[in-house]
Amino acid sequence: MIIMLSPAKNMKNIEVFDRDLSLPCFIDNTKEIVENIKTFAIEDFKNKMKINEKLAVLNKNRFESIKFDRLGNPAILTYDGIQYKNIEAENFTRKDEEFANSCIRIISGLYGVVKPYDSIYEYRLEMQTKLRVGEFKNLYEYWGNRIYKELIKEKTAIVNLSSNEYSKSIEKFIKDSDTYITCTFKVNKNGILKVESTQAKKARGMMTKYIVKNRIRDIEELKKFNLEGYKYKENLSNNSEYIFVKE
């Protein structure tokens, strides 16, 4: 079972991590994208990434500091969004880290696919950014089916715990013979079921932690997830979407 996660816009620097890190599988592609972005002026960052001047300066400096001559930090500890705060990877044991690295894959506009303990640098680059790379007019076109092929090579189920922006990068390549399941988290508001962005990110993080801590490799075991009031709803779910509702 492969767990597919989104990255996070917010990132943090890790002072000390004393375990070996691996390099992302598409590091040569990453270098190509970085060299492209290093030509950007501040205005390019602002316009293409839809960010303010302060963030544009920060990210220009981040990209200019990427040298690839030294290791960065572990991906799962560097991403700092709501989902990652609820994974709580800083509390993982060595066995947790090994299990997480075997099944979690983070989809990234810059790196393509990263394992939790791959080395990454701090950056900001959303998959939906209209960034031309060579002959490709955006990152979806640039990555093409490479992300899908990397995930599916394990010949096992893919569990989608990512946002639409990132799941979109592989869904058009999914075949009928593939086992691809999206976990959707909804809240019951006066009898109306809604996906609330913040709650969904939090739940995806909790589900990821639940999978790691319980060493889950069978998709049927996902249905037992019941943290913070969520319950699997058989009547709302199907073979490609597991729906969990918080009453």
UniProtKB/Swiss-Prot annotation:
Cellular component, GO, one term: cytosol
GO biological process, one term: response to hydroperoxide
Cysteines joined through disulfide linkages: none
Superkingdom of origin: Bacteria
Family assignment from sequence similarity: Belongs to the UPF0246 family.
Protein name per Swiss-Prot or TrEMBL: UPF0246 protein CD630_18230
Organism ancestry: Bacteria, Bacillati, Bacillota, Clostridia, Peptostreptococcales
